[in-house]
């Protein structure tokens, strides 16, 4: 769908919420985008009598499904993690009004002086998430899914980025390495896995640091996965 049509739909939806949240519609401005078809906007308003900003997620329903984000936001909030709260939703249109965790990512804030405290907070949040884990809630990080993601290394890094074609021995060696990785991951303790727990998705916040974003693809899988992403 034409982005201008989406923006018109978004503005119409916000207009219906403007009274409830005291939204200043003319303040709407792009906030960020990600590797999907989702876009994010920031809009000024009032919550509980205090002036603050909100985030609007624009997720075209032809390509995106907001339901995992909504469900996992609630799940992670129950684990006392600092995630965007879903304040308003229109799943059919792919529009969400979210609480705003600010502009400062870990990536932009990291330096030798700030790193110890930021990573201490990130470790604590990760432990908190893992302690809240229960089987049967999130999709399993299955062998098939892990295998598909390992094969991205061959397809995108070796073949497309480095333009390398492996010979039969190299291919066999890499396949053996992948099997060792798979066996190790599947034998580990299984917990909630954010799956993208790194400095671009962690926000520096004054309270309950860090704010955690981009969790909609979370699964139930190996306990070391998010640590590897973080470090």
Regions found by a protein language model. Give the residues of each.
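Active-site Asp-x-Gly
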Residues: 191-192, 204-231
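Conserved protein-kinase catalytic-loop position immediately C-terminal to the HRD catalytic Asp
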Residues: 200-201
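Conserved catalytic-loop position in the HRD/HxD motif
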Residues: 196
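Juxta-kinase regulatory segment immediately upstream of eukaryotic protein kinase catalytic domains
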Residues: 1-23
């Amino acid at each position: 769908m034409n982005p201008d049509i989406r923006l018109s739909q978004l503005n119409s939806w916000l207009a219906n919420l403007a009274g409830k949240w005291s939204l200043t519609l003319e303040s709407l401005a792009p906030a960020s985008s990600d590797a999907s078809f989702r876009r994010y906007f920031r809009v000024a308003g009032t919550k509980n009598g205090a002036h603050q900003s909100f985030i609007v997620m624009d997720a075209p329903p032809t390509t995106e499904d907001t339901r995992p984000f909504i469900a996992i936001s609630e799940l992670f909030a129950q684990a006392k993690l600092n995630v965007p709260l879903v304040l308003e939703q229109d799943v059919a249109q792919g529009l969400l009004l979210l609480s705003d965790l600010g502009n400062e990512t870990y990536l932009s804030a990291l330096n030798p002086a700030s790193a110890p405290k930021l990573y201490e907070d990130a470790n604590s949040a990760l432990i908190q998430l893992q302690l809240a884990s229960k089987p049967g809630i999130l999709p399993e990080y299955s062998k098939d899914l892990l295998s598909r993601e390992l094969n991205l290394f061959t397809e995108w890094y070796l073949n497309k980025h480095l333009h390398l074609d492996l010979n039969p021995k190299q291919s066999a060696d890499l396949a053996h390495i992948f099997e060792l990785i798979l066996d190790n991951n599947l034998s580990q303790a299984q917990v909630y896995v954010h799956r993208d727990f790194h400095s671009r998705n962690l926000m520096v916040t004054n309270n309950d640091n860090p704010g955690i974003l981009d969790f909609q693809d979370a699964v139930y899988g190996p306990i070391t996965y998010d640590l590897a992403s973080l470090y």
